């Protein structure tokens, strides 16, 4: 398995991430290297580069000096992509599956080709893989890290919690045509 390092933006998520088995946690708010890459060879780039190296040192504090990460699982996109491509180890890979902070990703291409790094897009799964993942869920072999479940008529409250960042760490779900949690199949959900 992997030795995961969680990157958080709120300290109250540290214990949650460590409880999931992370080897370590880094708070992104301790660094000022987020957003699109500044123009190379400018004072802004030099400042960005200093901060990225600080972030890399925080990784080394967890992995050991000189041990960069094999894979960066990149979700935010625009705001974090330049850093992800830098901290990934030589021959490593950045896997990107979304762009929640934006789709216009920038990076210093020199660190890609000189260190033979790879960028891989991922859209979760094809139909057969999605079916296999659903089977694992039904068999309760995966933990969805569920923090809260809302009945259908409370969807607006769930959205307000997310908007205000008041939701608990983990995933939230909504009951859709299910009377209660814990039901595993369509047949279980049928009221008899």
Q: Which residues does each predicted region cover?
A:
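Adenosine-nucleotide cofactor-binding segment
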Residues: 1-79
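Short beta->alpha linker loops
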Residues: 8-12, 29, 75-76, 100, ...
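Terminal peptide-recognition signature
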Residues: 17, 72, 84, 119, ...
